[in-house]
Every structure is written in C-alpha cells, then in structure tokens.
Amino acid sequence: MAQKEEAAVATEAASQNGEDLENLDDPEKLKELIELPPFEIVTGERLPANFFKFQFRNVEYSSGRNKTFLCYVVEAQGKGGQVQASRGYLEDEHAAAHAEEAFFNTILPAFDPALRYNVTWYVSSSPCAACADRIIKTLSKTKNLRLLILVGRLFMWEEPEIQAALKKLKEAGCKLRIMKPQDFEYVWQNFVEQEEGESKAFQPWEDIQENFLYYEEKLADILK
C-alpha cells in the first residue's frame, strides 16, 4: 500500500511539471520525485524547457497543470529617463502562495515614488479571484505602476466569480491580453533554458493559433 501511495505522489509531481511518467518503476527516479519539495515558490531567470512546453501550452482543458508560471519584465524609469530593467520567472503550487502574490511579496515588495514602473507578466493562466483582488489593491495604492498581463489560458473562465474578477482588473487599469503565438516565442527565447546543442528556434504546437483565438474570444466576451 505504501509503495502505491508513493507512486501516486510521484505521478502527480511529475505530471504537474510535464515530466516523463514512463520511468516511475525506477526506484531512484521515484525517490527523486518524492523528495521534491511539494509546496514552494521557485524563482529564477529561466525555466526548464519541458516545464514551458507543458505548463504554458494554451490548451482548452488544463488537466494536470496545477501550477502557475509567471515570467516578468520590470522597467523602472526615473525623471532623467534612465531605465532600470530586470526579468525572471516564478512558479508556484496552488496549495501555497500564488505566483502573482509572490511577485509583489518578493520581486517588487516596495515602490519608489520617484520612479515609474512598467511591468509585464507572461503567465501560464489568468489570475484567480484572490490574486486579482491583490493586484487591484496594489494598483489602487501605487499610481506609478502600469501592469500588462498576458496569459496563455483563462483560469476557470466560466465561473461568475472569475469573470467578475477579470472585469474588476480591467476597471482598475490592468491591461489583460491572451498570449499570441509571437508571445509564446518571446517567452521561449527570453525565459526558457536552452540545452547545449538544442535549436533556439521556437516550435509552435499544432493548435496554438486556434486556441489563441478561442481564448481571445472568451476574454472579449467577459470584458465587454
């Protein structure tokens, strides 16, 4: 029974990361997956390619994608026109703090009133209601912040609570967009680890344009 439970835990961990599920009979591989910390915020400059290919894919039904991946670009401009820029990514477990909240807690916990902030997020899925509320509160008290959020998928978009939250984001001045194929390519080139000898070129999946149009229509209906 214990071995079955361990295998189930490992399967869940692997599926969330888009990892290969074929080698879970290997005791060492199983031990490695089980020992991964289950709930944490991970930050870095580039995310693994297999995570991107699985987590950012703009599928209609996102089964197994129980994390949020957030890639960010922060540009802080002073009165002299000089721009300080930074970029990176965060990932979360949905049972812990979400990536959107973690961004304001760890990446940009304070705002210099002498600077103007232009922040762009590329997120695997749109914010939940609680994260939308946190974003709205931050925007309301930080007049020198402009936030653009590009999302691969819409999270639980049929739920009235989520629709209301997305509308409130728009009303608060947050720009919300669906990621186009060109945006996925930008993330691939700027935020994804490239293995030695691997082609830098982005390889779009078969239904990337179709799914973009699907989500773009849904978002337009929600925000109108």
Swiss-Prot record:
<dbReference type="GO" id="GO:0004126">
    <property type="term" value="F:cytidine deaminase activity"/>
</dbReference>
<keyword id="KW-0507">mRNA processing</keyword>
<feature type="domain" description="CMP/dCMP-type deaminase">
    <location>
        <begin position="64"/>
        <end position="169"/>
    </location>
</feature>
<feature type="region of interest" description="Disordered">
    <location>
        <begin position="1"/>
        <end position="24"/>
    </location>
</feature>
<feature type="binding site">
    <location>
        <position position="60"/>
    </location>
    <ligand>
        <name>Zn(2+)</name>
    </ligand>
</feature>
<dbReference type="InterPro" id="IPR002125">
    <property type="entry name" value="CMP_dCMP_dom"/>
</dbReference>
<comment type="similarity">
    <text>Belongs to the cytidine and deoxycytidylate deaminase family.</text>
</comment>
<dbReference type="GO" id="GO:0016554">
    <property type="term" value="P:cytidine to uridine editing"/>
</dbReference>
<comment type="subunit">
    <text>Homotetramer.</text>
</comment>
<protein>
    <recommendedName>
        <fullName>C-&gt;U-editing enzyme APOBEC-2</fullName>
        <ecNumber>3.5.4.36</ecNumber>
    </recommendedName>
</protein>
<feature type="binding site">
    <location>
        <position position="98"/>
    </location>
    <ligand>
        <name>Zn(2+)</name>
    </ligand>
</feature>
<feature type="binding site">
    <location>
        <position position="131"/>
    </location>
    <ligand>
        <name>Zn(2+)</name>
    </ligand>
</feature>
<keyword id="KW-0479">Metal-binding</keyword>
<dbReference type="InterPro" id="IPR050610">
    <property type="entry name" value="APOBEC_Cyt_Deaminase"/>
</dbReference>
<dbReference type="Pfam" id="PF18772">
    <property type="entry name" value="APOBEC2"/>
</dbReference>
<dbReference type="InterPro" id="IPR016193">
    <property type="entry name" value="Cytidine_deaminase-like"/>
</dbReference>
<feature type="binding site">
    <location>
        <position position="128"/>
    </location>
    <ligand>
        <name>Zn(2+)</name>
    </ligand>
</feature>
<dbReference type="GO" id="GO:0016556">
    <property type="term" value="P:mRNA modification"/>
</dbReference>
<dbReference type="GO" id="GO:0005634">
    <property type="term" value="C:nucleus"/>
</dbReference>
<dbReference type="GO" id="GO:0003723">
    <property type="term" value="F:RNA binding"/>
</dbReference>
<dbReference type="GO" id="GO:0005737">
    <property type="term" value="C:cytoplasm"/>
</dbReference>
<comment type="function">
    <text>Probable C to U editing enzyme whose physiological substrate is not yet known. Does not display detectable apoB mRNA editing. Has a low intrinsic cytidine deaminase activity. May play a role in the epigenetic regulation of gene expression through the process of active DNA demethylation.</text>
</comment>
<dbReference type="GO" id="GO:0046872">
    <property type="term" value="F:metal ion binding"/>
</dbReference>
<dbReference type="GO" id="GO:0006397">
    <property type="term" value="P:mRNA processing"/>
</dbReference>
<keyword id="KW-0378">Hydrolase</keyword>
<keyword id="KW-0862">Zinc</keyword>
<dbReference type="GO" id="GO:0042802">
    <property type="term" value="F:identical protein binding"/>
</dbReference>
<feature type="active site" description="Proton donor">
    <location>
        <position position="100"/>
    </location>
</feature>
<dbReference type="GO" id="GO:0044029">
    <property type="term" value="P:positive regulation of gene expression via chromosomal CpG island demethylation"/>
</dbReference>
